[in-house]
Amino acid sequence: MEGPEITFAEAVIDNGSYGKRTVRFETGRLAQQAAGAAMVYLDEETSMLSATTVGKSPREGFDFFPLTVDVEERMYASGRIPGSFFRREGRPSTDAILTCRLIDRPLRPAFVKGIRNEVQVVVTVTSIAPDEIYDTVAINAASLSTQLSGLPFSGPIGGVRMALMDDGSGARQWVAFPKHSQLKGAVFNMAVAGRVVGDDVAIMMVEAEATPDSWTLVKERGAQAPTEEIVAEGLEAAKPFIRALCEAQADLVKRAGKDPVDVPVFQDYQDDAYAAVEKLATDRLTEIFSIADKQERESASYAYLLEVLEELAGEGKDFAERKGEIAKAYGSLTKQIVRRRILTDQVRIDGRGLTDIRKLTAEVEVLPRVHGSAIFERGETQIMGVTTLNMLKMEQQIDSLSPETAKRYMHHYNFPPYSTGETGRVGSPKRREIGHGALAERALVPVLPAREEFPYAIRQVSEALSSNGSTSMGSVCASTLSLLNAGVPLRAHVAGIAMGLVSAEVDGQTQYAALTDILGAEDAFGDMDFKVAGTAEFVTAIQLDTKLDGIPASVLASALTQAREARLHILSVLNAAIDAPDEMAPTAPRIISVRIPVDKIGAVIGPKGAMINQIQDDTGADITIEDDGTVLIGATDGASAEAARSAVNAIANPQVPEVGERYLGTVVKLTTFGAFVSLTPGKDGLLHVSELRKLNEGKRVDDVEDVLGVGQKVQVEITKIDDRGKLSLSPVGAESDAVAETADAIESSQTEA
C-alpha cells in the first residue's frame, strides 16, 4: 500500500570543528487536516510536529489578531512516564511556556495586519535526544507549517540558538544549535530569529543570556567577556544559519505549499475618518502628549477622545455610525504625533532627549522580618524586590524534557492590575509574568555565588507596584538590591535598561531613532522593545521584541552601545544604595556544610533514618545529605547548626576522645551497675554506680533509678579509656558542684526544648 507523498528539504549547519547539524523539514505525511503541517528533525533523534489551523470566519467584536501558539511537551519524547498522579501531561511546563513566547514573538509581526480569524499554531515535541535543546528548532517548525497553510504571512522565519564557546586558549567560536552539555563551557547563549530581506538578514527576535559559568570562564580561565561588541558579533554570526534555514523552508513551500488563502483583512478605519480626526485633533493632541505625568496625560487624552467622538460621531454627525473608526483613528494619530516629534525634534513625550534616563531612587530593607527587601524606582515605574533563603532541599524540582532536574534560584514576577491603575484578574501567573520572571532570573544567575560558597535555595519575588515602562528591567535592579540586603554575596551588581526604537522613511531611506529608558506609551507607539541587563563589565541578558518584519543588526549593535551608557549610570545608583552584602537577617536560616566520607553516609542516616532523625530532634536543625558526602545543616540559629555539625562529625569524622574531656550527655540505659550515657551520637560511656554518690550528696546508691532516669541530661567527664576504647565517666566537679551543674544542665536543656 502506498503512503502519502512526503516532500522534504534540509539545511546543513556547519560548525567547523564542532561538527555539523542537520535540520530536516518534511510535510505531507502527518496531520493532513490541518491547514499546514510540518515535521522538523534536528539530526536523527529530535523531532517535532507543527500544525497551523485557521478559523473559518472572523471573530466578532475582536479588534486584535487572535493568534495562539501552544507547545506540547510529550514525555514519551524522552522515553518517560509523567510523574503526576494521573501519569499524564497536565499544564505546560515553564520551558514550554517560554518556548510559546519565543515562537509567538517573531511570528506575530509577520502576519498581515488586520486579520481577525483565529489562527492557532500547535508544536508537539515527539522525540528528543537527552542532550538537545528544542526551542529554536520549534520556531522553524512553526514558521514552515504557517507558510504551508497559505495564510498571508511574510515568512519564512529562521530560528537558531548560538553559543559562544571559549576555553580561554584564545580560540573562540559561535556554535549553532549547541547541546546542553556544551553550554557548560559557553560564555554566552542566545536564541535569534530573523528573515531574509534582500541580501541581508533582518533580526526579529533575540533572547540571550550569559551562562551560569560565564563568570568563572572569564575571570579564572581568561575567556572573552560577553561585551556589547561580542554580542553584536554573535548576531552577525547567526545570519548565515538563519539564511540557510529560511532557504530550506522556502524551497519546501515552493514545492508543497497551498494556494494563498483568502482571509478577510479589516482596516481599523477608512481614510476619511482619519482625515477628519487629523484636521480636528492634531494641535490639541500635540499639547496633550507633551504632558510628562502619565496619569494626567492619560486622563486628558481620554477626556479629549470623548470630545472628538461627540464632535465627529455624535448624533446626526457624519460619522455617527462609525464611532469605532473614529476611536481607532484617534489612537493612530496619537501614535504618529509622538513618533514624528521623536524623529524630527529629538524630543519625547515627557520632554526628555533620546538618551535621557528618568529620575532614579533605590532603597533597601523596606520590609520587616523578611530576609531581604528593596524598592527601585525609575520615574513612575516602581518595583519591590523580596528575597527568601532556605535549605537547598527547597530548590525547585523540574519535570520537563530538559535534563535539568532542579534549580536553586527561583525568580517570580507579579504584575497586579493596580500597577497600571486598572482592575483585573489576580491569581495564577500569566505567560507574560512567567516570561518577565525568567528574563530577570537569567540576568542574575551569572553573578550568583557558587552552590558550595552559598548553599541556600533562593526565591526572589519582584512585585510591580507601579508600571510605566520596563518593569522587567526594574525587577533586575530591585532584585540586585534585595539579594545584597539578604546577605547573598553577588559577584557584581546587575542593572537593566529598556531601549525603544522609532523608524520612518525619509527620502527613500529608513531612519532609526533609538530611545533610552522607554515609557509605556513609547513601547506601545514604537517599533521595538529591547531590554539589556548586565554588570559594569559585560552583558548578562538580552530580550528583543519588534513590531517590524526585522531590524538591521547594525541598528541593534548601536542600541547595545547606547544601553551600556545607561546601565553604568543605573549601576552607580545601585552601588550608592548598597555596595556590598549586608549581614544576614536574624530571621534567615543559618546553613553550614561539612564533608563526610561517602562510606559514612549510611552511618549518619542510621537504620531507617533513626540516627539522622535523632540528631534533628535533639538539635532542631534540618539536615540534607548529598551523594558526594556534602552534609548541609540548616537551623534558625547558629548554635543549633553547630550542635548538629558536631553530632555529624562525631559519627562520620570521629575524633579519638581523651581523658578529661567534658560532655553534656544523655542517659540512654540503666543497669544494676550504673548508667550508660550518650556523649555524641554513636559514642557512649559508663557512669558506674560507685560514681553516682557524687549526685546523691555523697551517700551510697543502691538503686540507680533513685538518682538517674533514661533521657536525663548529666554533665560528665571522661576519667578512663581502656584498651578496647570503652569510656569510664564521672560526674563533673565536687559533690555539690556536680549536683548543681547537672541541675543547671537539665534546666537549660528543658528551656532550649
UniProtKB/Swiss-Prot annotation:
Its cofactor is Mg(2+). GO terms for biological process: mRNA catabolic process; RNA processing. Belongs to the polyribonucleotide nucleotidyltransferase family. This is Polyribonucleotide nucleotidyltransferase. Its EC number is 2.7.7.8. Keywords: Cytoplasm, Magnesium, Metal-binding, Nucleotidyltransferase, RNA-binding, Transferase. Mg(2+) binds at residues 523, 529. Residues 733-753 are annotated as: Disordered. Pfam families: KH_1, PNPase, RNase_PH, S1. One of its GO terms (cellular component) is cytosol. Disulfide bonds: none annotated. GO terms for molecular function: 3'-5'-RNA exonuclease activity; magnesium ion binding; polyribonucleotide nucleotidyltransferase activity; RNA binding. It catalyses: RNA(n+1) + phosphate = RNA(n) + a ribonucleoside 5'-diphosphate. Residues 589-648 form the KH domain. Involved in mRNA degradation. Catalyzes the phosphorolysis of single-stranded polyribonucleotides processively in the 3'- to 5'-direction. It comes from Micrococcus luteus (strain ATCC 4698 / DSM 20030 / JCM 1464 / CCM 169 / CCUG 5858 / IAM 1056 / NBRC 3333 / NCIMB 9278 / NCTC 2665 / VKM Ac-2230) (Micrococcus lysodeikticus). Residues 660-732 form the S1 motif domain. NCBIfam families: polynuc_phos, pppGpp_PNP, PRK11824.1. Coiled coil: none annotated. It is found in: Cytoplasm. The keyword Transferase applies.
